[in-house]
Amino acid sequence: MERVVKDGKVAVCYSPGFGAGWSSWADDELKETLIFHPAIVNMILEDKEHLINEQWLVDNFGEEYKYVCTYGAHDLVIEWVPQGSLVRINEYDGYESVEIYDTDNYFMA
């Protein structure tokens, strides 16, 4: 999937507000789109994330997105991470954060 890259960093979309997650509440096969897709990134960059709802997702990505919970869309932000990084979205009570895999925060057993 295409990603938005700026100055060697990739845009990662996530919702740091408590209450409802964004990609963390979606089915696994839909998460990559919700995290990286340029259409979503551009909505955030244009301060239009509040316009993202179920119908917007269906119109842009298809029927399989009609059950994505969009309650967290109004809190969407972008974290720019180094291109090629392994990332995952962590979630607690709807609050999402971006975790970047590196040798500083992972240990081998």
What kind of feature is each model-predicted range?
Residues M1-A109:
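Catalytic phosphate/metal-binding cores of nucleic-acid and nucleotide-processing enzymes, i.e., regions
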